[in-house]
């Protein structure tokens, strides 16, 4: 994860993820790379609704795996995943984001994914909202149930709070 804050108070953030299973096979296929929300089987992620598949708590976003904010059908791989996430400051708390990724399952064709949108960075790394605009699914904002696609970050880790208030605000 690389972040750069420019003198005009705009931020650039770049993240790259590469995951490859060397010994995963079809008979023992318990481990996978995920584009977005992981299954959190180790219980290390701070999900508010870990087992939620619908509703507000299912929309929580934690930067893990491919870091995608859009929700896709079958967004996982048992072999290879390459992903990058780019955020660019637009104006005050508004940032544009771009997610690009490639998934490859064993004995399957490669699948390409992308997602773009606007990030409302209210409290960096603590409370953020992601509004998808376009993705491999098509134009996201046209969906009549668009509110189900909005993702949020809400961190309750003490380290996040300390980092939040130790930054220069003025």
Q: Can you annotate each of these PLM segments?
A:
Residues 1-89, 105-106:
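C-terminal outer-membrane beta-barrel translocator/porin domains of Gram-negative envelope proteins
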Residues 4, 18-25, 98-106, 124-126, ...:
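Transmembrane beta-strands of outer-membrane beta-barrel pores
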Residues 4-10, 88-94, 121-126, 158-162:
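Outer-membrane beta-barrel strand-turn architecture
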Residues 10, 76-82, 110-116, 121-123, ...:
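Residues that define the transmembrane beta-barrel architecture of outer-membrane proteins
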Residues 12-16, 94-98, 118, 127-129, ...:
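Transmembrane beta-strands of outer-membrane beta-barrel proteins
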Residues 88-96, 103-110:
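Intrinsically disordered, low-complexity segments enriched in Gly and acidic/Ser/Thr residues
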Residues 120-126, 146-170:
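Outer-membrane beta-barrel "beta-signal"
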